[in-house]
Amino acid sequence: MALRLLPFRQYDEQDVVNLFALTNAEALESTTGDGVGSNGVFVKVADGNFDQELISYGSNSYLGKTDYPFVNSDMYPTVQLEVTAADSGEAPLGLTLNQTAKTDENGEKLIYNTTKKEELQAVLPGQTVPVATKGIFTLGKNALAGDSISAAGITVGAGFEVADNGEISGVSATTLGMVIGTGSRTSSGGLTDQFAGDYVVIKLG
């Protein structure tokens, strides 16, 4: 599942940057996958050149076949300013609030179902992805280095930093913010919890 952010969060829209798209190569093929196209990923600026056209138009296989002879072609808009997953030792802009994905769990293209796209907390490849720079957020195990609190070295009251692929790990100093709580979720009542495992609550900024 391409969601690393759990529902509990507190942030101000003034602390959200809506300028950058995730690099196309990092977009998820499906919302059932997990990767740097998920939400809750710490990202850095990959392209911040404001001298270029902010939106470009071109052919894109995501639209299907677009080069029929003697027929006008469809052009796909893409935001040129881009972010990419931050790695260890790099300064992140913030963490993504939406996933970037092409299709839903049934393989249906999200470009044709805007309502479902919103329900899945997704944006399309090339669309701006909201990036939070400050606030309180709950991150699932797939946002932690090593997929667990112990492997990531997370300690309540201590700081955290960016690990590889936009995940986080614990540090003694409050580098990016502070870990203010931890917990774990389990499946129960015969129902599968898609967020089962460790989770942490962080104060960013």
Model-predicted regions and their roles:
Residues 1-205:
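Surface-exposed, low-hydrophobicity beta-strand/loop segments enriched in small/polar/acidic residues
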